[in-house]
């Protein structure tokens, strides 16, 4: 007795065998998290229209709860000096806050992260407004922290220091300013 085999069935069985054999390959190594491209590869964060990091001086003052703000320098790097009154203690002196914004148009996120670690900062990876970012806490002459993100064609940072004050959380203010910059629309 002869068995009749359908040619379509032979092709189907052969395709399944080839597919299973091809999909059973073992790959060595370890998994690494994908690094997505920045969400805004062509956006500029430079100094324009008397704004640093796309933010007006008044919005920076409000964001950190300061009473006064002065910007002694503007350009690729913008420097601010702010003062914030004491919280509930009329006898305490006001807190002086130093803030620096920088945007390096062709900067490298990995380079900035390596430099922060090399200089002794405690580096914490995070994501801010869909951008790969890190916080770098380094208290030398007061509580200080920078929030840095890959953005546009480069990297931008907000650095906040509570001058002469060992306590407080400058990372909260730095991350808030970074978030405001990344959300800003011109």
For each predicted feature, which ranges?
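Post-signal peptide N-terminal segment of mature Sec-exported envelope proteins
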Residues: 33-51
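C-terminal motif of bacterial Sec signal peptides marking the signal peptidase cleavage site
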Residues: 18-22
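Bacterial signal peptide processing site
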Residues: 24-27
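Short, solvent-exposed recognition patches
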Residues: 65-136
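A short, solvent-exposed beta-edge/loop patch
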Residues: 117-186
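Amphipathic alpha-helical segments
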Residues: 48-66, 185
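Extracellular/mature segments of secreted proteins
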Residues: 31, 58-64, 84-93, 153-154, ...
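Bacterial N-terminal signal peptides that target proteins for export
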Residues: 1-13
């Amino acid at each position: 007795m002869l068995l009749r085999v359908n040619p379509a069935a032979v092709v189907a069985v052969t395709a399944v065998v080839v597919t299973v054999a091809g999909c059973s390959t073992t790959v060595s190594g370890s998994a690494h998290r994908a690094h997505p491209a920045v969400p805004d590869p062509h956006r500029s964060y430079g100094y324009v229209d008397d704004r640093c990091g796309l933010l007006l001086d008044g919005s920076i003052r409000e964001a950190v709860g300061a009473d006064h703000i002065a910007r002694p320098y503007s350009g690729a790097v913008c420097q601010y000096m702010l003062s914030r009154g004491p919280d509930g203690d009329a006898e305490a002196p006001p807190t002086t806050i130093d803030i620096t914004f920088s945007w390096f148009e062709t900067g490298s996120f990995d380079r900035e992260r390596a430099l922060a670690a090399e200089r002794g900062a405690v580096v914490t990876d995070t994501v801010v407004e869909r951008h790969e970012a890190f916080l770098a806490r380094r208290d030398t002459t007061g509580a200080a922290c920078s929030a840095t993100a890959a953005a546009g064609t480069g990297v931008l940072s907000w650095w906040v220091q509570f001058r002469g004050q060992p306590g407080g959380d400058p990372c909260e203010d730095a991350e808030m300013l970074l978030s405001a910059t990344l959300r800003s629309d011109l």
